[in-house]
Amino acid sequence: DIPSLDLTNMVMQNADIILATGGPGMVKAAYSSGKPAVGVGPGNTPAIIDDSADIRLAVNSIIHSKTFDNGMICASEQSVTVLESIYKKVKEEFLYRGCYFLKPDELEKVRKTILINGALNAKIVGQKAAAIAEMAGVAVPPDTKEQLQVLHRR
């Protein structure tokens, strides 16, 4: 089929969940579809790991993408959604590969460091995860590859 708005709407009506990337029109259409939707704009790339995934490969790919150039490329993952049935294995793999899961109080410190008055703090751009944590007053191992936070679990 040739891509079209009609075809896109048909796919959205028959999907269980919609992951909409691209311009504001596409994201708005996904949110208006009546289906659960994750809408992202430029530079907010999500990843979804389901139970058919090769967990080791998925986690390694996400880390490789996110740590290349310290996440400067807008195509690097900004969020990861994981099925509950494989959550523990995925978390263990992230930990095994040098990632750090922020505790709630640490998350608040990091948030206040990366966002100042609702705008991105330019001082964190292109910095390694451990450097951002240090700026926030959070102690992480110096070889930490990425800082992660569990935002919602069901």
Where are these regions (language model features)?
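A glycine-rich phosphate/pyrophosphate-binding beta-strand-loop-alpha-helix module
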Residues: D1
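Short acidic active-site motifs
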Residues: D6-L7
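Structural alpha-helical scaffold elements that stabilize or flank donor/cofactor-binding regions
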Residues: M10-V11
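An anion/phosphate-binding loop that grips the pyrophosphate of nucleotide cofactors and donors
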Residues: A15
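Glycine-rich phosphate-binding loop
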Residues: I18-A30
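ALDH superfamily catalytic-core signature
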Residues: V27-R154
